């Protein structure tokens, strides 16, 4: 709910010429949390036990709630009075559930059921004047649809990198989990630094240009990841992670800016929710692709020294697929057109 509404509120509050900067700061804050979360969680777990993680998270939640109640005085219910689409919401939730579970478990019946529900959902939503998901918007707004596709491809190509590199650093390089975590933090740290800058730039340059450049940098980093082996220096791994973080930062804020700037004010909530949906589905697809590659190449086995070579080969295949997805994402990003006259 937070991810689905935060960008909509920011877009409603800030004028178009400052929208990218605001979204960039928000994105940078998200990535800062991603950087500090694993480190803070590790410190808390090691010193105070795993329950302390949930206690501290609850405290942060209450603090955020207090800040929102005190300082967020306005209201942005631009679609107030419209009927809520309960039927469409139920179909939508069921569709995502079956698709994500089907791809995660490689269950053909669940995948087919998810696809059938997707077709029903599109047909049903296309008939409504007040749908939960603006299918007509996707079909009629090229900038919105291609920007959403670019986001989906970017998340699908990058989310599982942290998972693969965590295993690589622990199994192949022999680091403990805490050290591997410190190394992996280099990616979101770079993202936190450059996301606000990219958002600011997208207020002055067409977002599609900035986002496409970011997609290109991300593609390059994934190609470099596809070249790793057991002898790759850790310094190279850190450099690849930082390059990936820079590419994602350069893409994310401008792409979100393009999505939010391509729709009318009354669709801000739907557009923001679409960004969150693309993130969720893309991340799920990313992990599903990794699991599929490993399942087809080595099956369900424990990663022991005798399988280290196969693990590296599977990882390289996965990175190659991710690079291809990101490469196609460049064209989706470039094809969206201008958002400014």
Regions found by a protein language model. Give the residues of each.
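A residue-level signal for alpha-helical anchor/packing sites in multi-pass solute transporters
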Residues: 9, 13, 43, 71, ...
